[in-house]
Design a protein with these regions (language model features):
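Catalytic histidine-centered segment of alpha/beta-hydrolase-like enzymes
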Residues: 154-167
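Conserved alpha/beta-hydrolase catalytic His-Asp/Glu region
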Residues: 63-91
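Conserved alpha/beta-hydrolase "acid-adjacent" motif
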Residues: 128-134
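Alpha/beta-hydrolase-fold serine-hydrolase catalytic core, especially in secreted/extracellular enzymes
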Residues: 44-48, 67-68, 117-119, 133, ...
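Short beta-strand/loop motif that positions the catalytic acidic residue
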Residues: 114-115, 120-123, 127
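Primarily recognizes the serine-hydrolase "nucleophile elbow" in alpha/beta-hydrolase
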Residues: 1-64, 93-94, 126
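Short, conserved loop/helix-junction motifs that constitute active-site signature segments
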Residues: 112-115, 141-143
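Active-site nucleophile elbow and catalytic-triad environment of alpha/beta-hydrolase enzymes
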Residues: 39-40, 94-111
Length: 180
């Protein structure tokens, strides 16, 4: 099971709770929503604005029964130079409930249950979207066999960059655990 970013967090969580998953690959994933968001909404204004948005979302849902819609970049800030990696027509407004559920999401709590099945953690060494420490922490909590690769010269959307090093890491790992 493979995922990137939020999909990577979901792939790790799913592998941790479902033994039918034979292996997991996480690219730029995260294990603790609150810690991830604290690393993304840095500064005296950004973190309070983010937590107020979640509070407004909860109140709006309670008062109206409807979700409060917020711009995607208020949930996960993506630098301008990486926004071209989003597919044309991508959804740009999300319910505040999305931020709340991500904030509460903790793949860290189940990553250790993946073992003895293999886990591959890939992360940019200087990820401008998801803090690199998220994959490092999952590695610390994981059992074996787990491989962690922190890769220079790529950013958050490493599979979209066509970097041959990423392809080689992935190919070699798959050949090791799933020889043909």
């Amino acid at each position: 099971l493979i995922g990137s970013s939020f999909g990577a967090a979901v792939s790790v969580y799913t592998a941790g709770v479902d033994e039918r998953v034979s292996a997991a690959i996480s690219s730029g994933g995260w294990g603790d929503g609150e810690r991830k968001f604290r690393g993304q909404h840095i500064g005296d204004e950004a973190w309070p604005a983010f937590t107020k948005m979640m509070d407004r979302g909860r109140k709006h849902r309670e008062d109206t029964g409807e979700p409060l819609m917020v711009p995607r970049y208020e949930i996960v800030p993506i630098p301008e130079h990486l926004r071209r990696n989003l597919a044309p027509g991508s959804v740009m407004m999300f319910p505040a409930d999305t931020a709340i559920s991500m904030y509460e999401f903790k793949a860290d709590n189940v990553v250790g249950q993946i073992s003895p099945r293999p886990l591959l953690l890939l992360h940019s060494s200087e990820d401008s979207v998801t803090p690199t420490e998220q994959s490092v922490e999952m590695f610390k909590r994981a059992g074996q066999p787990t491989d962690l690769h922190l890769v220079a010269d790529v950013d958050h959307f490493m599979f979209g960059e066509g970097n041959p090093r990423i392809i080689t890491i992935l190919k070699d790992w798959l050949e090791k655990y799933f020889p043909v």
